[in-house]
Amino acid sequence: MIFEKVRNIIAEQLGIDPEEITMESSFIDDLGADSLDIVELIMALEEEFDIEIPDEDAEKIKTVGDVVEYLSNIVE
């Protein structure tokens, strides 16, 4: 499932427990990510799913759920 993959990538990138990550988690407010973390996270997701996320789409991604929804529309 996409959520598990995304959660593991986020946990690894941010150095946090995967159990802390929910669909509603905000990268900045809940998970403590800064703008550099988000750029690195987008790059890791692009590599994992073999896709390219345009900057205008990346700017709209604020929560874990946003990532999962975005990837679901592209990958499946």
UniProtKB/Swiss-Prot annotation:
Residues annotated with O-(pantetheine 4'-phosphoryl)serine modification: 35
Involved pathway(s): Lipid metabolism; fatty acid biosynthesis
Keywords recorded for this protein, A-Z: Cytoplasm, Fatty acid biosynthesis, Fatty acid metabolism, Lipid biosynthesis, Lipid metabolism, Phosphopantetheine, Phosphoprotein
Listed GO MF terms: acyl binding; acyl carrier activity; phosphopantetheine binding
PTMs per UniProt: 4'-phosphopantetheine is transferred from CoA to a specific serine of apo-ACP by AcpS. This modification is essential for activity because fatty acids are bound in thioester linkage to the sulfhydryl of the prosthetic group.
Entries under PROSITE patterns matching the protein: CARRIER, PHOSPHOPANTETHEINE
Pfam family membership, one: PP-binding
Domain Carrier: from-to ranges: 1-75
Superkingdom of origin organism: Bacteria
Record localization: Cytoplasm
GO terms under biological process: lipid A biosynthetic process
Primary localisation category: cytoplasm
GO cellular component: cytosol; membrane
Positions of disulphide bridges: none
Known function: Carrier of the growing fatty acid chain in fatty acid biosynthesis.
Protein family membership: Belongs to the acyl carrier protein (ACP) family.
HAMAP family, sorted: Acyl_carrier
Designated name of the protein: Acyl carrier protein
Natural source organism: Caldanaerobacter subterraneus subsp. tengcongensis (strain DSM 15242 / JCM 11007 / NBRC 100824 / MB4) (Thermoanaerobacter tengcongensis)
Organismal lineage: Bacteria, Bacillati, Bacillota, Clostridia, Thermoanaerobacterales
Gene: acpP
